[in-house]
């Protein structure tokens, strides 16, 4: 079975075949770096990290581009509020982004272009659009895209021009010929910092948001590439506008496949600052370990809405603990995955059907159950290898199981285990039981086996 991906453009599952055999070129819209990453960013980063991992596991070379928007109205406002330069703000937020991504086990993209480094390419694309009659300079000095002159506009969102409304980031201005037209080049405003002003054939100004991704995508991956991804909130207007700009300029299909990850809710409500349920990745990592957060994201399908709650995170922690418990029973063998193995074949079938991580995770639990029964190092090795395709179970099992025991350090716990062993050797069962109960009250669960006693953190809840 070959890989099939749900293509937002066709609204159907399609067999995937890269334009260049064996080489997948993928572009994903990254962060606008004016603040810390939030849960929505975590969802997108993990989703497309899994995509690129599976493409590589399937034998493809992957060129993965995830851009950074480092010039934007929000960035300008935040820098002015903070009394710092835009470069200072964006550098700081990019460092924070990398720290958060590293914590979640996100592999770095092949390229991470900053919009401000590709202004010449943006100017070139705007010029091509103007030459083709698809762009014009308004009376206010801005250069706009003439939406109604591009015949394919609306094909991604599936709406006619009459249905479409100007999107959240598309400000309707006096200089536009049509409310649906969107800005390609913003003329400079007197109060704006000098560091956001570039010379252009249309006067000093800065690029619009949409042209940034079109120019960077074409520059780094070519005028036609394989996969373009991002959150569902970007489908319109951002991705619709990217298609119009890119295909309007080049006359070629921009991306073969368009992928969109689902929204994230908090306790069944949309996450927003106004509702007081807005969480940064760092907020969440204060309460839960990073692999639990990653597992919480991975075990839902990337296109499904994801509901964040303490109940779901604690459940994810407990589920991940069961997998690590299996790996703690026997040292996993180093194995090269045999995709004809029944469990590996089921895992592959799940991932090849639009990156079906819920079904793939179910296979991991089947293997964990087999490890619990057989104590097979080869089965444990297969479990670890398949989980690695999802960026999971690569840590030390005992370290994971023992994490979160804040009141007692490991040395104190081991001392109590030794005291309990001495009590049992002396047949002082009451003392041995007292120590076990005292540790349990501290959140420590003891596990006796013929090989000795181990411990782990008790499940929260």
UniProtKB/Swiss-Prot annotation:
Gene3D superfamilies documented for this protein: Cysteine-tRNA ligase, C-terminal anti-codon recognition domain, HUPs
Keyword terms, alphabetized: Aminoacyl-tRNA synthetase, ATP-binding, Cytoplasm, Ligase, Metal-binding, Nucleotide-binding, Protein biosynthesis, Zinc
Cofactor note: Binds 1 zinc ion per subunit.
Ranges spanned by the short sequence motif 'HIGH' region, renumbered to the chain: 31-41
Intervals of motif 'KMSKS' region: 270-274
Top-rank taxon: Bacteria
Cross-referenced InterPro entries: Cys-tRNA-ligase, Cys-tRNA-synt_Ia_DALR, Cys-tRNA/MSH_ligase, CysS_C, Rossmann-like_a/b/a_fold, tRNA-synt_1_cat_dom, tRNAsynth_Ia_anticodon-bd
Enzyme class: ligase
UniProt record, GO biological process: cysteinyl-tRNA aminoacylation
UniProt name for this protein: Cysteine--tRNA ligase
């Amino acid at each position: 079975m070959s890989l099939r991906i749900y293509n937002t453009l066709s609204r159907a599952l399609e067999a995937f075949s890269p334009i260049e055999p064996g080489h997948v070129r993928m572009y994903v819209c990254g962060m606008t770096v004016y603040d810390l990453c939030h849960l929505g960013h975590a969802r997108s980063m993990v989703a497309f990290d899994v995509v690129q991992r599976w493409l590589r596991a399937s034998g493809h070379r992957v060129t993965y581009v995830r851009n950074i928007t480092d010039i934007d109205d929000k960035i300008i406002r935040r820098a002015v509020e903070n009394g710092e330069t835009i470069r200072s703000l964006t550098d700081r937020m990019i460092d924070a982004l990398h720290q958060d991504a590293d914590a979640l086990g996100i592999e770095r993209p092949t390229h991470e272009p900053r919009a401000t480094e590709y202004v010449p390419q943006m100017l070139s694309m705007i010029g091509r659009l103007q030459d083709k009659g698809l762009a014009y300079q308004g009376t206010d000095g801005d250069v706009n895209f003439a939406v109604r002159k591009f015949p394919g506009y609306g094909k991604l969102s599936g709406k006619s021009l009459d249905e479409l409304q100007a999107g959240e980031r598309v400000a309707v201005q006096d200089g536009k010929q049509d409310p649906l037209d969107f800005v390609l080049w913003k003329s400079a405003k007197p109060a704006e910092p000098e560091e956001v002003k570039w010379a252009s054939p249309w006067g000093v100004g800065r690029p619009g948001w949409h042209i940034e991704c079109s120019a960077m995508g074409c520059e780094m991956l070519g005028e036609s590439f394989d996969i373009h991804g991002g959150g569902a909130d970007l489908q319109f207007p951002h991705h619709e506008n990217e298609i119009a700009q890119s295909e309007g300029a080049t006359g070629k299909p921009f991306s073969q496949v368009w992928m969109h990850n689902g929204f994230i809710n908090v306790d069944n409500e949309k996450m927003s600052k106004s509702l007081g349920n807005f969480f940064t990745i760092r907020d969440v990592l204060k309460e839960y370990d990073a692999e639990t957060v990653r597992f919480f994201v991975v075990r839902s399908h990337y296109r499904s809405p994801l509901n964040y709650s303490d109940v779901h995170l604690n459940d994810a922690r407990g589920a991940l603990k069961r997998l690590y418990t299996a790996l703690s029973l026997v040292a996993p063998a180093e194995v090269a995955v045999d995709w004809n193995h029944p469990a590996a074949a089921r895992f592959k079938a799940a991932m090849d059907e639009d990156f079906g991580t819920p079904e793939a995770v179910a296979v991991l639990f089947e293997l964990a159950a087999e490890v619990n029964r057989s104590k097979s190092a080869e089965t444990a090795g297969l479990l670890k290898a398949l989980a690695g395709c999802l960026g999971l179970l690569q840590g030390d099992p005992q370290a994971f199981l023992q994490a979160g025991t804040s009141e007692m350090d490991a040395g104190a716990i081991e001392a109590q285990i030794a005291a309990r062993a001495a009590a049992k050797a002396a047949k002082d069962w009451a003392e041995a039981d007292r120590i076990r109960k005292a540790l349990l009250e501290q959140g420590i669960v003891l596990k006796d086996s013929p090989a000795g006693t181990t411990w782990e953190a008790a499940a929260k809840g």
